[in-house]
Amino acid sequence: MAALWLSAAALGGCGVQQVMLDTENDYLFLAMDTLSPPGREIVLQAQVRGGGFLRGQCGLAVRFFRDGVLFKVAETGDDGVAAVTFTPGAPGDYEFVAQVAPAGLGQSPPEPAALLVACRQPDAPLVLVDLDKTVVASGFEAVLLGTPKPMDHSRRVLDRLAQTRTIVYLTHRPELLGPKSKRWLADNGFARWPLLAGTAGGFLKGSQAYKAAWIAKLKKTFTNLEIGIGDKISDARAYLDNGMRAVVILDMPPAGARDRQAKLKRLAEELKSLKDDEKAQVVIGWDQAEKAIFEGAACPPSAMRQRLLDLAKGE
């Protein structure tokens, strides 16, 4: 179903795209966040897409600014991507703004897009956090069409985690939703942490495979991927397989929901795939996640599985 919504967004007219993807003047302008260790040359990328199929726009000049000063200029290729190199000298957050020059555009250029380089030492502790039904209280469809709310306590707990760790938003959302995702996070008071998204092809492969691929990529540079937080049990398996702690914030069917009993049983069955391990914690809500992470509260998969089965019996 999510794939159908994504296709509708990409193939729809400018009105549909504006609602679903936050396009501007028939253009979608993407700027990709990244992580890097100090002293390594990296590539900063921004992409211009446009038209009914959101094709890459070739031959446009994209200016990259840092601290309000022009850093470099690059021209978009056939895929609409403009790329420049940058070498962060020391750990810290390096903020850039990418801007499309108006020359060659049929309409006014889209608004500038922010790009973050989070430079960290290779042994810096990282926390990977999903967005939908984890930070955002709704699923993919509501993100495209509505104004979803944050999960209760999510911002507070993430701020607490960020005092000693680097937060990375690792979302299964495709990069087409990057501008909308960043705007939502800012509008709801979340700190500016790197947002890693994937291609449409990666989206279609499924969340677990997508997360596993990103983890493998990050592990080539960063040795302390500490915690993964999300709503999907399958994602937790990807985190655990890579030696991380996994905190599953279950997407519980609300009381009175249609087929609630079947959904509770399905969640309980899925939890069988997680062994009771001090690194696997299953909770309901960010307040419980906070206790599991900071206070060592025991939240084993088997206990949650039994709770789900007990709830199902009462339906």
Task: State each model region's role.
Residues 136, 167-168, 246-250:
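Short hydrophobic alpha-helical runs that function as membrane-insertion/retention elements
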Residues 1-4:
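Bacterial N-terminal signal peptides that target proteins for export
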Residues 142-167, 178-179, 209:
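Short, acidic loop-to-helix structural element flanking the phosphoryl-transfer center
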Residues 6, 12-114, 314-315:
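Intrinsically disordered, serine/threonine/proline
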Residues 16-23, 143, 174-315:
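C-terminal cap/substrate-recognition subdomain and adjoining C-terminal extension
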Residues 125-140, 239:
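Asp-based phosphoryl-transfer active-site loop
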